[in-house]
């Protein structure tokens, strides 16, 4: 199952896959931001995408313990940033309470 992070929590991630909803803060060096702060990627953005500073994307990252890779970008309308923040908050609450919102084995 792919995890969810924000710019503050991704800094402590070492392994696994995660998705972050964030704005492009800088292209060189690659940097993203959300309401928790900014995060400078340790890898380039996934290739094949046109982007401008201020664009909102869902960023998919893979961590293998020693490196990170941005494998996919999905552009989304800026109005969805608040919706994603609410979903992330609800997911974290469910995890804290020991509940799963989506089963990792669901088809």
Swiss-Prot record:
GO terms for cellular component: nucleus. It is found in: Nucleus. Expressed in the germline. The keyword DNA-binding applies. The keyword Nucleus applies. It comes from the Eukaryota. Belongs to the RMI2 family. This is RecQ-mediated genome instability protein 2 homolog. It comes from Caenorhabditis elegans. The gene is rmif-2.
